[in-house]
Amino acid sequence: MNTELLTAPESLRRLVLDLRQMETFIEAPLVIRKADGVWYEDVNGRRILDGISGIFTVNAGHNNRRIIEAVRAQLDTMAFAPPLHATSPPAIELVRRLSEVTPEDLNTVKLLSGGSEATEAAMKLARQYHRQTGNPGKFKVISRFHGYHGATMGALSATGTRRRKTMFEPTLHGFLHVHPPTCYRCPYEKTFPDCEIFCARTVEDLIELEGAETIAAVILEPVGNTGGIIMPPPGYLAELRDICTRHEILLIYDEIITGFGRTGSMFAAQTFDATPDILCMGKGMSSGYVPLAGIAFRDSIAAAFLGREEDEVEFSHGHTYGGNPLAAAAGLANLTEIEERGLCARSREMGEYLRCRLEDLREFGIVGDIRGCGLLAGVEFVADPETRASFDPSSRFGVEVGRNALEKGLLTRFDPNWIALAPPLVITREETDLMLDILSDSIRETVKKIRA
């Protein structure tokens, strides 16, 4: 295709990218034509190291032949099955395989095609479950500030990030929010472990204020992305598990980002040894080769939806592409790749090395906190590490670092106050070194610029 035509303003203005202002994008457009391993290549032949797996998605790496061949073989057999009337062999096999790797008795799976679909489905499942088990008044959902659960209206209502939802308010009724465990900047001005996980106890306080008989579910990301990779302190998730159990509230993990090896285990629920009632999965579920997502839930929940057609207890939810055979084939191959190549262990090993290298960034005097587990890491930038004072908002320090890194050939997830790294789980030590070298150079230049 004609490169000049692809990057021409009149061509790009017809396209709407996610969360981007196109007038800014067309000034320096990034049009990628191919990818391999941990590398992208744009239409001009420039190579870019993928430091965030596309968008926390390509866990098994780009141009993975096992996944590609599995999808190709399925294309030769059947591309689409009627989701209202039937299923397909790869969908059945994928659900079986997933039941073997999900924690405890999360054995039943509803296949979907995107993360927002998964979180929507999880919250709807929770509400319908309570209605069908004699608790129709349990409809409210508790989530966390800074959390992001998707772009559809229900998922957005659970989202606690103001700039993602302001334009669409009012959002739906029945969604409540609490503070996440941002230990580096505790909103309660407490210090772990002396705090006795006070932030978890505020969830129970809210439940008691609202009335447990009105709360259907608590939904959260085990490791929060928005806010700069927010890590739960030891015992936090276990405490929430106990609270939800005591009040007969379903605990939902949004593992769209953290699933499939990202945190060093197949799921973050296993990394932190605290199992939810419903687990949302997506992104790394197929490594992005075909859109795929799903929810896995406990046997006791599944039992409430089993019956004859005349009982009308089936889960009242569905999507055209849910359980698509191409997506299921990709998911099966992806799961095999993660297991046979030991990518969970690799995530732990390379993640430790990544965080060790990130510590070197403290020499610049602008690193406040380094957070993460497995191949999921965040760096919070501060103007003064001693006082933890943030940069002046007008400096947009993290954005400048991220854009500088992209110019140098490294793709990251950046925000005014932090930057995140989550490369494909196949990344090598040498590629990790290169990633950190580029990031280091980018920070050095940005510091020099703002202090000039």
Predicted regions and their residues:
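Conserved N-terminal phosphate-binding loop of PLP-dependent enzymes in the Aspartate aminotransferase
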Residues: 2-452
